[in-house]
UniProtKB/Swiss-Prot annotation:
Reaction(s) catalysed (UniProt annotation): (6R)-10-formyltetrahydrofolate + 5-amino-1-(5-phospho-beta-D-ribosyl)imidazole-4-carboxamide = 5-formamido-1-(5-phospho-D-ribosyl)imidazole-4-carboxamide + (6S)-5,6,7,8-tetrahydrofolate; IMP + H2O = 5-formamido-1-(5-phospho-D-ribosyl)imidazole-4-carboxamide
Alphabetical keyword list: Hydrolase, Multifunctional enzyme, Purine biosynthesis, Transferase
Organism: Pseudomonas paraeruginosa (strain DSM 24068 / PA7)
Name the record gives this protein: Bifunctional purine biosynthesis protein PurH
Domain comment in the entry: The IMP cyclohydrolase activity resides in the N-terminal region.
Pathway field: Purine metabolism; IMP biosynthesis via de novo pathway; 5-formamido-1-(5-phospho-D-ribosyl)imidazole-4-carboxamide from 5-amino-1-(5-phospho-D-ribosyl)imidazole-4-carboxamide (10-formyl THF route): step 1/1; Purine metabolism; IMP biosynthesis via de novo pathway; IMP from 5-formamido-1-(5-phospho-D-ribosyl)imidazole-4-carboxamide: step 1/1
NCBIfam families: PRK00881.1, purH
Segments forming domain MGS-like: 6-151
InterPro entries in UniProt: AICAR_Tfase_dup_dom_sf, Cytidine_deaminase-like, MGS-like_dom, MGS-like_dom_sf, PurH-like
GO biological process: 'de novo' IMP biosynthetic process
Length: 535
């Protein structure tokens, strides 16, 4: 069976949309192709106001819209026209005056936008639960053998092009039907998520607790890429992205050149980009195996990202080999040249890539170059997920940040202004290092990173070893710990290494002993009251 033999000509279409983007031009093209248009409510008025001939559904069914528009299309003459099997139900349709409807263009009430409003209450949300729309969508998708369903304005042009070629093929109708079921599935999921957070005890109207966890968790992800393999070659893998686009991320980034992203590339790029987003001034983050191995921040007038890259690389040049590099400023040609002439790199990501940088990196065809766009200074709340066997752990994103005024000085000596700058820098980095995490830093450059050890004191030892190996001086540096020190040995070792100031959450049963150790060594120590475990 060829495409030509499965093409479905369209004689009658029903159009009823909440999002009216492109619908006037779409309907005009259909009419030009000889298609009769049925429509409802606001869509009908819009078409008529633009000079497009259409029949109102109420006139076709002989039954008016009622109950403030709750009942418009729920009628046998509508659903019979959509669901009727052309090879089986023709006689029944003719007997009851039901005309075949060959194309349905419907999108649904804006439920998500409605419940996102701060003043939305339960009655408002309920009125924005679409009933007739999903019913028509599902009817048309079920009968895709004989009917085309269009739920996305982005498909209008392709549908018109197919009709001009003689009709929609079965493969095209099947794909449109799949999109339709994905659309209604996501819509029902949003409703269930919202209703699952309603606290009926607050008032008779019911109020959504926007920080609550719904009874069932519904989220839709769309396959963006099939991968050669997963974390290891014997594992199959694909990359799925959230259907609803959020802030700039690895999921929204555009790949400008290079080999296809691997499973590990995506995970590591996410770690690098999310870390570099923490800094307002020009910054560079180099990541290997999801851990920052070098981070630096340099103001524009002191060298910007070009200098920041040099300093980040200097932290651990061995680990930087084959790493991921992220910037929070546009990648310029000079910085790009410094990277490709110095090291092997898997991925470079930045909010923008200059033409000069693209030209430089083009000489290294395998380097993956990603442009992700700008992000807001304020991080948006959201959810983090961790899969366990048979379940899913869900938590709010760790967007906790601290400022100098949030720090609690617990030692006799207060940190200097420069130490405070370095402590906050090191704290931001420690948040993205696998626990137990220790970060040594000076002048907003990491000088040693200890990651992923079962004991915190061993992470501190590794950070010191890394610094020594890189030829970086620990004496005079500061130290950040992602969680509290359970014993004073971590501070004693820091003192021996020459650390002058420490930032940590506090909260240990032995905080007094840890503070005493810092005082004995004249180390300034501050508590954040916030932990940043990362497993």
């Amino acid at each position: 069976m060829t495409d030509q033999t499965t093409r479905l000509p369209i004689r009658r279409a029903l159009i009823s949309v909440s999002d009216k983007t492109g619908v006037v031009d779409f309907a005009r093209e259909l009419v030009a192709l000889g298609v009769e248009i049925l429509s409802t409510g606001g869509t009908y008025k819009l078409l008529r106001d633009n000079g497009i001939a259409a029949v109102e559904v109420a006139d076709y069914t002989g039954f008016p819209e009622m109950m403030d528009g709750r009942v418009k299309t729920l009628h046998p003459k509508v659903h019979g026209g959509i669901l009727g099997r052309r090879d089986l139900d023709g006689a029944v349709m003719e007997q009851h005056g039901i005309k075949p409807i060959d194309l349905v263009a419907v999108n649904l009430y804006p439920f998500e936008a409605t419940v996102a409003r701060p003043d939305c209450d339960l009655p408002s949300a309920i009125e924005n639960i679409d009933i007739g729309g999903p019913t028509m969508v599902r009817s048309a998708a079920k009968n895709h053998k004989d009917v085309a369903i269009v739920v996305n304005a982005g498909d209008y042009a392709a549908v018109v092009e197919a009709l001009k070629a003689g009709g929609l093929t079965y493969a095209q109708r099947f794909d449109l039907a799949l999109k339709a079921f994905e659309h209604t599935s996501a819509y029902d999921g949003m409703i269930a998520n919202y209703l699952g957070t309603i606290d009926q005890t607050r008032d008779t109207l019911g109020t959504a607790d926007r920080g609550a966890f719904p009874r069932t968790f519904n989220s839709q992800f769309v396959k963006a890429q099939e991968m050669r393999y997963g974390e290891n070659p014997h594992q199959s893998a694909a990359f799925y992205v959230e259907a609803k686009k959020g802030e700039a991320s690895v999921s929204t980034a555009i790949q400008l050149q290079g080999k296809e992203l691997s499973f590990n590339n995506v995970a590591d790029t996410d770690a690098a980009l999310e870390c570099v987003k923490s800094f307002l001034k020009p910054a560079c983050v180099i990541v290997k195996h999801a851990n920052p191995c070098g981070v630096a921040v340099v103001p524009e007038d002191e060298g910007g990202i070009r200098k920041a890259y040099d300093l980040a690389y200097a932290t651990d040049s061995e680990s930087a080999f084959g790493g991921i590099i992220a910037f929070n400023r546009e990648l310029d040609g000079e910085t790009a040249r410094a990277i490709v002439e110095r090291q092997f790199v898997e991925v470079i990501i930045a909010p923008k890539i200059s033409a000069a940088a693209r030209e430089v990196v083009a000489a290294k065809a395998n380097v993956r170059l990603l442009e992700c766009g700008e992000w807001p200074a304020e991080r948006a709340p959201g959810w983090d997920f961790k899969r366990v066997n048979g379940g899913l752990l869900v938590q709010s994103r760790d967007i906790g940040m601290i400022k100098a005024e949030d720090l609690k000085i617990v030692t006799r000596r207060a940190p200097t202004e420069q130490e405070i700058h370095d402590l906050i820098f090191a704290w931001k980095v420690a948040k993205f290092v696998k626990s137990n995490a220790i970060v040594y830093a000076r002048n907003r450059q990491t000088v040693g990173v200890g990651a992923g050890q079962m004991s915190r004191v061993n992470s501190a030892r590794i950070a010191a070893i890394k610094a020594e190996h890189a030829g970086l001086e620990v004496k005079g540096a500061v130290m950040a710990s992602d969680a509290f020190f359970p014993f004073r040995d971590g501070i004693d070792n820091a003192a021996k290494a020459g650390i002058t100031a420490v930032i940590q959450p506090g909260g240990s049963m032995r905080d007094n002993e840890v503070i005493a150790a810092a005082d004995e060594a004249d180390i300034a120590m501050v508590f954040t009251g916030m932990r940043h475990f990362r497993h």
